[in-house]
Curated annotation (Swiss-Prot):
Assigned protein family: Belongs to the chaperonin (HSP60) family.
Residues the entry annotates as binding ATP: 29-32, 50, 86-90, 413, 479-481, 496
EC number(s) from the headed UniProt entry: 5.6.1.7
Reaction(s) catalysed (UniProt annotation): ATP + H2O + a folded polypeptide = ADP + phosphate + an unfolded polypeptide
UniProt superkingdom: Bacteria
Alphabetical keyword list: ATP-binding, Chaperone, Cytoplasm, Isomerase, Nucleotide-binding
Protein name: Chaperonin GroEL
InterPro entries associated with the record: Cpn60/GroEL, Cpn60/GroEL/TCP-1, GroEL-like_apical_dom_sf, GROEL-like_equatorial_sf, TCP-1-like_intermed_sf
Gene Ontology BP, a term: response to heat
Source species: Deinococcus radiodurans (strain ATCC 13939 / DSM 20539 / JCM 16871 / CCUG 27074 / LMG 4051 / NBRC 15346 / NCIMB 9279 / VKM B-1422 / R1)
Task performed by this protein: Together with its co-chaperonin GroES, plays an essential role in assisting protein folding. The GroEL-GroES system forms a nano-cage that allows encapsulation of the non-native substrate proteins and provides a physical environment optimized to promote and accelerate protein folding.
Pfam family, any one: Cpn60_TCP1
Phylogenetic classification of the source organism: Bacteria, Thermotogati, Deinococcota, Deinococci, Deinococcales
Principal EC category: isomerase
Record flagged with keyword Cytoplasm: yes
Amino acid sequence: MAKQLVFDESARRSLERGVNAVANAVKVTLGPRGRNVVIEKKFGSPTITKDGVTVAKEVELEDKLENIGAQLLKEVASKTNDITGDGTTTATVLGQAIVKEGLRNVAAGANPLALKRGIDKAVAVAIEEIKKLAVSVEDSEAIKKVAGISANDETVGQEIASAMDKVGKEGVITIEESKGFDTEVDVVEGMQFDKGFINPYFITNPEKMEAVLEDAYILINEKKISNLKDMLPVLEKVAQTGRPLLIIAEDVEGEALATLVVNKLRGTLNIAAVKAPGFGDRRKEMLRDIAAVTGGEVVSEDLGHKLENVGMEMLGRAARIRITKDETTIVDGKGEQAQIDARVNAIKGELDSTDSDYAREKLQERLAKLSGGVAVIRVGAATETELKEKKHRYEDALSTARSAVEEGIVAGGGTTLLRVIPAVRKAAESLTGDEATGARILIRALEEPARQIAANAGEEGSVIVNAVVGSDKARYGFNAATGEYVEDMVAAGIVDPAKVTRTALQNAASIGALILTTEAIVSDKPEKAAPAMPQGGGDMGGMGGMDF
């Protein structure tokens, strides 16, 4: 396919038009008085949302060059959302402001590369200031506030804080759709994995279709068990204690499974068997996690263990085990805390070094199962459209709460970005030429989120910004929800996670500065429409004038 090439100012202005198209649609959602955006869907009801990244993802422009600019700004929103789950609208507004101010200076003759260096240096200073202003999150009240602001709903904040209280800050919290109108929080205590009983004859409670083992031993075997002779010694030892036994293995089959079922039916031994969770290397690690929680050892050929030689000291213990057809929950395992902590620290080390989102998600699941438990928030609503929108807000609020726990909170409402301006201005004074201009571009952009929040609340943005910047109180700001100035935004509960503010600024500056240094665009040339098919003759040639 033929390509079209566009250069210089024409290329940059095309990108700017695309950036503006996305930003103008997204920024109306910013702040407590931000408006909704309705998104048409090809199938089903339209989506109504106040989430910046959802709006940004739907924007596709007809002009190919402008669409490239739109895609670049969408990347800012998506990247910010992937890392923190919030701050997408702030990032979009910052990106638009950097592009607008930057291109004005490039058109006036400034060196784009020097501007980029100045912006990068100013961003580094701003991030250090944000870290200094951050306050660590110690209690559920702060989590409630930050999650409530993200969702624009105090009830959402309350439920997220309640769930984090129950399962711990490292715990797994999942958001699901409820079949009813009400939203409820269910907490699963202990370690849960998604494998159920191998055979329904292991069920102890036919009404609930579940097997419950009290004060049970746990045999954790890495390989399949099919030979009865290998398993017989450990079965005899457990039978002498009179306690139940759970077998976790890659699989249990053949005569081994038949013997277990027969012993269960005769009442000789209260026993159940489940398949090991996960696959490959992840399965090995998950079995070691279970061993740490229960105080047992994994029977592994890699470590020189053989099933026929397993002693009672290698078996794990748990106060209660509940098994359904789909999942197994181990409550109150008897493992030593030191071993569990060692596993937790090892997983945290892997989390820091991995680049894969999928691997990170699985590691966080393992971490949560070791740390406390799993909470499920089932979101209810009257209609499907409301349910989708509400579920999305819960997901955003949860990500925001996690970010707050990670790096602390700062004053919200765009206040923190205004508070870092003096430090950036001081840094700009040490720069020269176009680098200093680049730093000043960032200073102007830092004002934009507060301006937009005020504008969406029906106030004059410049007046609000000047009033906040003019105050010598570090947390003085404007509460757009009430239209009043606040002495201490953090005390008033108007907060943002420091990680969200930092990530939004970094991503916006990254894409904004790249657009300034663009000198040419190569894109597909629009295809000419194919000529229309010629119309057929009136009398259809020699068909003899067919009559109808």
